[in-house]
């Protein structure tokens, strides 16, 4: 039997498989694993979200726990040479946030882009991107 190319395997991910992956990710966010639950990369785009909007760690957790299968945009193999075989999950969703520095500001829907590495055994969940979608 011919081996499928990785991109063909990705397209073949069923809704059930995505749901299982999402449940694994959310279980880590909710319960923590190995004394830690997740970490967000200190990238400029990720920092900008916190500078522009009132967003606490609890709000980030709420957003992550609210992800659904329909928020998946892509599942792919990582291209990081130190982590071969890791799976990268990408999501897009809107969420109401209050902008900073605007007097009497109200909530506005912010399109978010979230990219995380599905951890292997004994690894924490690493969130590469958590910022406004471009």
Please describe what each predicted stretch is.
Residues 1-93:
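Compact soluble domain cores
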Residues 89-105:
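Short beta-strand segments that buttress and anchor functional surface loops
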Residues 102-134:
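Enriched for short, Lys/Arg-rich terminal
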